[in-house]
Amino acid sequence: WLKVYTTIDPDLQEKAEELVKKQVAINKSQYGASSAALVSMDNKNGGLLAMVWGPDYFDIEHGGNNNMVIAKRQPGSSFKPFVYALAISKNPIGPESPVADMKTNFGKWTPDNYDRSFKGIMTVRNALAYSRNIPAVKMFYLGWREEEIVKEVRSFGMSTVVENAGYGAPMAIGTAEVRPIDLMQAYSVFANLGIKRDVHAIEKIEDSDGNILEEYKIEENKEPIFSPAS
């Protein structure tokens, strides 16, 4: 027989399942949505701590046994920080630099904000914090080209964002589909000051005599994939 050691934290897994059930109940009453997913990891070593892809695995009618954690979905505003990171890394701008949140025609597209209002001149930091759409699109253009942004987010782990897909500027507000587990890994890069860790669920595997057959080893002295300053 084999003994498999996983990275899953039983307490966090239980709490994650409870949270998903509660949130699904809210989503169902407000939006008619019957499912949700949650995935978490240790930013420092990439170990998967909890993973839930629905309130009830056996609820086949509502896709309970479909793993939504690896399903492609539009990330919406959660994609914006990556656009900002590239813009800041390629331009002489920072968190306190001004950016205009006002009605702007980007050629064939004039986007709006969620609340249908405009805040005028604000800092880059606040534009991201308040999730304003127009500044995010401006950051997209400061990131040089769509290919540059695709290359960056793929380096963060979002492998479902592909080249030559024609996302265009709407990509800045999250139209390119990603997998929740990849988005989680990408966000961990921010928390880990630019260091990307591989997501894994198995720590080690031993045989019946206690011999280690396989063991995950973290890569030491790994170079950051982007500047911590960004």
Language-model-detected regions and their locations in the chain:
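Mid-domain, small-residue-enriched loop/turn segments at the edges of structured enzyme/sensor domains
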Residues: 110-113, 143-185
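Short glycine-rich loop/turn motifs
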Residues: 33-38, 45-49, 113, 123-125, ...
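Conserved catalytic neighborhood of penicillin-recognizing serine enzymes
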Residues: 44, 93-149, 196, 208-230
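Glycine- and acidic
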Residues: 1-4, 62-70, 133, 163-171, ...
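Active-site SXXK
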Residues: 16, 45-46, 66-99, 127, ...
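Generic, well-ordered alpha-helical scaffold segments in large soluble proteins
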Residues: 15-23, 90, 130, 139-142, ...
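A penicillin-recognizing enzyme superfamily signal
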Residues: 6-29, 38-42, 51-52, 59-69, ...
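Surface-exposed patches in mature extracellular/periplasmic domains of secreted proteins
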Residues: 3-4, 26-38, 96, 160-171, ...
